[in-house]
Regions:
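Aromatic/acidic, Gly/Pro-rich catalytic loop(s) in extracytoplasmic/lumenal soluble domains
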Residues: 470-522
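Transmembrane-helix motifs of polytopic, lipid-linked glycan transferases
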Residues: 89-110, 147-148, 152, 299-306
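Membrane-interface helix-loop-helix junctions at transmembrane boundaries of multi-pass membrane enzymes
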Residues: 3-8, 108, 113-114, 159-161, ...
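Hydrophobic/aromatic-rich transmembrane helices and adjacent perimembrane loops
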Residues: 132-133, 184, 324-377
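Membrane-proximal, lumen/periplasm-facing interface regions of secretory-pathway glyco-
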Residues: 293, 383-437, 444-470, 512-514
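Short acidic/glycine- and proline-prone juxtamembrane loop motifs at membrane-interface regions
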Residues: 134-139
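Transmembrane-lumen/periplasm boundary regions of multi-pass, lipid-linked membrane glycan transferases
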Residues: 42-50, 79, 156, 174, ...
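Membrane-interface transmembrane helices that cradle and orient dolichyl/undecaprenyl
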Residues: 147-165, 175
Length: 522
């Protein structure tokens, strides 16, 4: 590659990374409008870990969560305090680095840096990627782990350098510490291994050391969690999954095949037809991909399916080996395998969070039509070249505008977004901060709803939490200064306390987005 061309590519990559970082950090305090209780549970666990010094491999609350992300959040909370930024900075970092990972992996797979730039561009401006890079969920680590580990793996297959396999294994082994969906990813390695046996003569003889090094390296980083899952705490491994698994006869009601067919169809169509209907995961009812990327993905998917069939036929009927088969099988296996956590679950499909491991694969598959046009460009006539250039400019402009506008204008200003992120709980948190610390504050709320308030206000004194069914146990020491705060319309609890303290004034607090809470005070 020429020096000038290299500098241009580096410059474009840096511009894409800067755009990605900006989209993942802009107004992070207020978009999303609240801290969802699942995020806050991470924060509360991280605060407890900081106070006790017990940083765990696995946190059992909230159905159980792998500890790596929470422990990183503990570090940022210790540094920045109990803020939205501290809770989400690691999502921002991993989300931005995944853009770099896709660039590296796509460049390696296509042996073309332009392919890498296109992939980086598509994921940088993707609503799906932006959204989960701005929420404090551990799942955002999965695309990061997979893109970088697979990059070094394919680089090692090309260079035969052992250190690439070591790095690939060490990164891949960390994946078991991230999110439950990662656990199906070994199926991708199995499919790739079979493909390598098919396409390369004497693969085992030539690569047995490299394979061994990769496996040993991944076990080094995975070992602590594997020991926890399979020796010390087997119940950790099974947490969260069995109750919603479509393999459970109580769930599929004896219709396993038809149930899987239905959930698989829902999982696959979400990229281009109807996306996740949960506004925390997507902007419903729109597909996960913008229309142009969605079309590119469909074309790319049909292309790799055709090439897999074609190259397998050539291999077994005419003994023609083509190493590109490895790439096609790898991408297809990645897509299908990382869909398994979604389509084997019975609830909430389509589900953009459970399938987040497919994100890099979907983006890389979407690169294929762009590369076909680029390859054919020189064979086009002058007039058609102008048309192609104009279309490319319009396409990339649309991609850069469509999803950011959807996120920062439509999503950000949607009252529904405030509702699904429990934004009223952050309003309550801000309200509490303005109250004299000496005043008793009785917060009537549910177990999960109290978590954002606790996370944002860990040190405010005279704050007491009660369930709506426990209000009869509330006994303020000074009724003149006590304040009762209700995060929801629990009218039985509200009316009970209004009757018990008739001199207090009831107030409905409601902003323009509909974020609501209630108070009872003198």
């Amino acid at each position: 590659m020429k020096i000038k061309q290299k500098h241009v590519i580096i410059g474009l990559l840096m511009a894409i990374l800067m755009a990605a970082f900006t989209l993942r950090t802009a107004n992070i305090k207020n978009i999303p409008a609240g801290i969802y209780p699942d995020e806050a549970q991470n924060g509360v666990d991280a605060q407890l870990a900081n106070s006790t010094g017990e940083y765990k491999l696995f946190y059992e609350s909230n159905y159980g969560r792998e500890g790596l992300f929470i422990n990183l959040q503990a570090l940022s909370i210790k540094t920045f305090g109990p803020t939205e930024f501290a809770l989400k900075i690691w999502s921002i970092i991993f989300g931005t680095l995944t853009v770099l990972g896709v660039f590296l992996l796509a460049s390696e797979l296509f042996q073309n840096k332009i392919a890498g730039l296109i992939g980086a561009y598509l994921i940088a401006f993707s609503y799906w990627a932006i959204n989960f890079s701005r929420i404090g969920f551990r799942a955002i680590m999965v695309p990061f782990i997979l893109s970088f580990s697979f990059y070094f793996l394919f680089k090692g297959l090309r260079t035969k350098k052992l250190h690439d396999f070591v790095i690939a294994g060490l990164i891949y082994g960390l994946g078991v510490h991230t999110y439950i969906a990662f656990r199906v990813s070994p199926l991708v390695l199995v499919a790739l291994f079979i493909s390598l046996l098919i396409t390369r003569k004497n693969f085992i003889a030539n690569y047995w050391k490299h394979t061994l090094v990769f496996v040993v390296a991944l076990f080094i980083t995975a070992a602590p969690m594997l020991f926890d899952f399979f020796i010390f705490n087997p119940h950790h491994y099974a947490s969260r999954t069995s109750a919603i698994s479509i393999l459970n006869p109580e769930v599929n009601q004896g219709k396993l095949v038809s149930s899987i067919a239905k959930t698989f169809a829902l999982s696959l169509q979400k990229y281009v037809v109807m996306g996740d209907l949960n506004m925390r995961h997507n902007y419903p009812p729109y597909a996960l991909l913008n229309p142009l990327t969605g079309v590119a993905f469909l074309i790319g998917l049909f292309y790799i399916i055709y090439k897999i069939i074609n190259l397998l036929w050539l291999r077994f009927r005419k003994d023609i080996r083509n190493e590109k088969l490895d790439i096609y099988i790898f991408l297809f296996a990645w897509l299908i395998a990382l869909l398994i956590p979604e389509f084997l679950a019975s609830e909430g499909n389509p589900h953009a969070l459970r399938s987040i491991g497919t994100l890099p694969a979907v983006i890389i598959i979407s690169i294929i039509p762009f590369m076909w046009v680029l390859k054919k460009y020189n064979s086009f006539g002058h007039g058609f070249r102008i048309f192609v250039i104009s279309s490319a400019i319009a396409t990339f402009a649309f991609i850069a505008i469509a999803d950011p506008v959807k996120y920062f204008i439509y999503f950000a200003n949607s009252p529904k977004q405030h509702e699904v992120f429990d934004a009223n709980l952050r309003v309550v948190s801000d309200y509490i901060k303005a109250i004299n610390p000496s005043q008793e504050k009785f917060i009537v709320t549910g177990s999960m709803q109290r978590l954002p308030i606790k996370y944002l206000n860990p040190n405010i004194s005279n704050t007491f939490y009660f369930y709506p069914g426990e209000v009869q146990n509330i006994s303020p020491s000074n009724t003149d200064s006590a304040i009762f705060i209700f995060t929801g319309a629990d009218w039985d609890a509200i009316n009970y306390l209004r009757t018990k303290f008739p001199n207090m004034t009831f107030q409905d607090h409601r902003n323009s987005f509909g974020d609501t809470f209630y108070t009872l005070k003198n």
